[in-house]
Amino acid sequence: MTTARPNSYRSGPDERGHFGIFGGRFVAETLMPLILDLEKAYADAKADPAFQAEMNSYRTHYVGRPSPLYYAERLTQHLGGAKIYFKRDELNHTGSHKVNNVLGQIMLARRMGKRRIIAETGAGQHGVATATLCARFGLDCVVYMGAVDVERQQPNVLRMEMLGAKVVPVQSGARTLKDAMNEALRDWVTNVHDTFYCIGTVAGPHPYPMMVRDFQSVIGDETRVQMQEAEGRLPDSLVACIGGGSNAMGLFHPFLDDPSVEIFGVEAAGHGLTQLHAASIAGGRPGVLHGNRTYLLMDEDGQIAEAHSISAGLDYPGIGPEHSWLFEAKRVTYLSATDDEALAAFQLLSRLEGIIPALEPAHAIAKVMELAPKKPKEHLMVVNLCGRGDKDVPQVGEILRKRAKES
């Protein structure tokens, strides 16, 4: 484990859950006792060697960690420039990084005596991971999913139902991830006695952004060790896609105090930053949503704007509060990739490396296609391949068929 130093980028949040002006806990009065209970339970679990040992055992024997650090030789040759490595978190059980966080939260729920688990999901990967761990531990599971996402992510809906979860399509608002999170929060308020809300990203009220980051930091901790083994030194740059930003925070956090490591987060630019998109840093401003202050997409009246991305997992009008702080602190550079750029990267990676990525990390690959050729050959670049693309093949196939007909 890497440890934070004084004046560190890794020392947040403070005791009230703030990263600078971001974060906090803006919740209904009925939820505050739960939030405080959760914070205490997490602090106790974090300090308990038995909890950590049990989690590490499940990571090894159930999740399949550590995930490999893979040299993408053909992509490197194709692009010229930087030597590109993939952190292969799509090889985890359930097919994405989401299981890292869900394992920790479900273990915490059991420790707190909660038998009913609720979750929100966009692409369905967090929902699948939650349904999987609930099946493993014999817990009731309800997953809220925007009706639009239910349509475009049918394979994951079927997986969740197969695993015994109840999937609730959300018909309000734009019927995507924000609306699913709203419904999950409503459920939690009315079922506080027996229900644990398993949030899927580094958002929500404190302690969620910190807790999810800590559970996901296994990605960056492994990468440090693996890169030293492979190259004898740290990487020169890191690249990861960002919706709420948990896969990115998991990779970035252990490297924040290494000034030699450049860090790039990639938001979803959708149809373009002047049109419909989901790039909260590039096109948003600070506000409050889902229990925390962060950068959000808002209209001129301060109402939350609708986000758009080809990728259901990035289709969220906000970003984790720690990302907002890292942006303002200028430690991380935030870029954005359009739907079309992500589609091109999805196809390129499938054909060059025999790896079909999820549309979410395809956004990160799209920016690697721009960044890598500008770097010298000795530059070591690590990309978090945070999800596999099985869930997206029907959607991408349909888009490509339509385009072929039109051309």
UniProtKB/Swiss-Prot annotation:
Gene Ontology annotations for the cellular component aspect, listed alphabetically: cytoplasm
Top class in the EC scheme: lyase
Pfam families cross-referenced by the UniProt entry: PALP (PF00291)
Keyword match Nucleotidyltransferase: no
Modified-residue entries (N6-(pyridoxal phosphate)lysine), positions: 98
Entry-linked Gene3D superfamilies: 3.40.50.1100
Pathway: Amino-acid biosynthesis; L-tryptophan biosynthesis; L-tryptophan from chorismate: step 5/5
Substrates-to-products reaction catalysed: (1S,2R)-1-C-(indol-3-yl)glycerol 3-phosphate + L-serine = D-glyceraldehyde 3-phosphate + L-tryptophan + H2O
Subunit note: Tetramer of two alpha and two beta chains.
Family label: Belongs to the TrpB family.
NCBIfam families assigned: trpB (TIGR00263)
Name the UniProt record assigns to this protein: Tryptophan synthase beta chain
Origin species: Bradyrhizobium sp. (strain BTAi1 / ATCC BAA-1182)
Taxonomic placement: Bacteria, Pseudomonadati, Pseudomonadota, Alphaproteobacteria, Hyphomicrobiales
Gene giving rise to this polypeptide: trpB
